[in-house]
Amino acid sequence: HLPQNDMPMLASAINFLLRDEEFDNLDQICDYYHEDRAELEKKLAEAGFSYSEEQKRFI
């Protein structure tokens, strides 16, 4: 499961999964963990993170 109460840890976990090529993109992660992508991005944006499609990671 993904850490839901710690936004830096959540961003780090997602970046780790993408970097280590466990998943090809954020949509695959959301599908696997049954997360709504828009809600996930909104929650992380409120904590100062934005998703870079080009870099395939939260920055």
What are these regions (language model features)?
Residues 26:
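Helix-turn-helix DNA-binding elements, focusing on the entry/boundary residues of the two helices
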Residues 29-30:
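Short alpha-helical "recognition helix" segments of helix-turn-helix
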Residues 1-23:
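N-terminal acidic leader/helix
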Residues 53:
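Short, acidic, Ser/Thr-enriched surface-loop or helix-capping motifs
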Residues 11, 33-35:
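Functionally constrained cores in energy, signaling, and assembly domains
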Residues 35-50:
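Short acidic, Pro/Gly- and aromatic-enriched capping/linker segments at domain boundaries
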